Amino acid sequence: MTIFRFITRRLFRPRTEARSLVLGLWTAAVFSGGFSIGFGGGFGGVAFAQSLNFGGGASDLPIEIYADDGIEWQQENLVFLSRGNARAVRGEVTVFGDELRAYYRENPDGSTDIWRLDAYGKVRIKTAQETAYGKKAIYQIDKGVMVLSGGRVRLVTATDEIFADRQIEYWENKWMAVARGNALAVRKKKRLHADVLAAYFRVDKQGKNKLYRIDAFDRVKIVTDTDTVTSDRAVYNVESGIATLTGSVKLVRGKNVLRGCSAEINLNEGVSKLYSCPATAAGAGKRARGVLRPKRKEQKKVQPIAGPKVQK
């Protein structure tokens, strides 16, 4: 096994925000800062909904790269290749892949910048509390965009799981993560389905990144222990537990079916409110409607009392 160890060197003022929000932020604080060309370059880490700050003093931590089949430095192509059960470790963050690639550029002042990072094969991005799985990961550092794709992409945290058939993206400057293609978010027995899920984060009073809102687009479906609700779009307030659904809303509970233009579902308390369509210039809006089927108690069948047997 080849081991490659180096220390990154920062060439610009460190960022003070906790920028590593979701889905594999492969540390811009490390790679935008460059590396010592004599020792090579490497990979940083990722974190999902973690308060990891790669822009502070942790930027001086060494990055260690391991590869069973060796590490290749292609100077003409300005890229480092790590092959064979490759992994990159920095602090509590590890990137695994069959192959890891770090693309760099040379600046006029002689410094170097890593501008793109790729991972291929059995990609796994692991932090202390989260693990993301896919077959391909690309982080474009200049744009602040990371894309994890390949098969059924999956992200697992202590409380949640997120799946997507197409890809999961992280937009660093927007503090936003997007899951595309038959996306699914699972927490305990609650499930949120949609073609696209967009998750938004912000820093709480403790300085940690916290998920506060999820937007769901197209073929939205929320499933709980008692209800199944479908709509065209939904906005879920994570802190209050309230989901607001709009467009062709349908709520099913047992044999009861309710329909309307919008609905408010409190996922914490199990309370649902359905609303009719507002009136327009063309006329009155559509009313909310429903079919309720009350449960009836099943009557116990009375068994006939057997009389004495008559002997013939």
Where are these regions (language model features)?
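Mature-chain termini and adjacent capping regions
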Residues: M1-F12, A18-K312
